């Protein structure tokens, strides 16, 4: 990826985002986000000022998802650039959550806003239909 490839940067950070989520690595997951970070899901707006603010919610969410739904992993169904500029990309995404036996928990469309901060691409905001 080069500075001239904003969509490539957005894809790389969203790969790291999902890989760290699947590994239940909250610290690595938090490192893929820009702060302050906005998440709109389950009818709630969450604003995390920094990684220390996000980590407890991420750890709790990962644990609850495993216990409540039997979640094992998630996969991207698609990631499509809606708009792309030199420092910001809007992605139309959808992911599916799976149980260990491969059965589907649900499909969740979302919009992600990816920004470049210095030489890094990070997820600044997410609006999804995921619980």
Segments (PLM) and residue ranges:
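A solvent-exposed, acidic/Ser-Thr-rich amphipathic alpha-helical stretch
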Residues: 27-79, 87
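Short, well-ordered beta-strand segments in beta-rich or mixed alpha/beta enzyme
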Residues: 17, 38-43, 88-97
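Hydrophobic/aromatic beta-strand elements that line small-molecule binding cavities or substrate pockets
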Residues: 76-82, 94-97, 109-115
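Short beta-strand segments enriched in hydrophobic/aromatic residues
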Residues: 33-34, 95-97, 127-128
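Short beta-strand edge/turn micro-motifs at domain boundaries
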Residues: 105-131
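Short, low-complexity N-terminal intrinsically disordered segments enriched in polar/charged residues
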Residues: 1-35, 40
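Residue-level signal for tight coil/turn positions that link beta-strands
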Residues: 86-88, 118
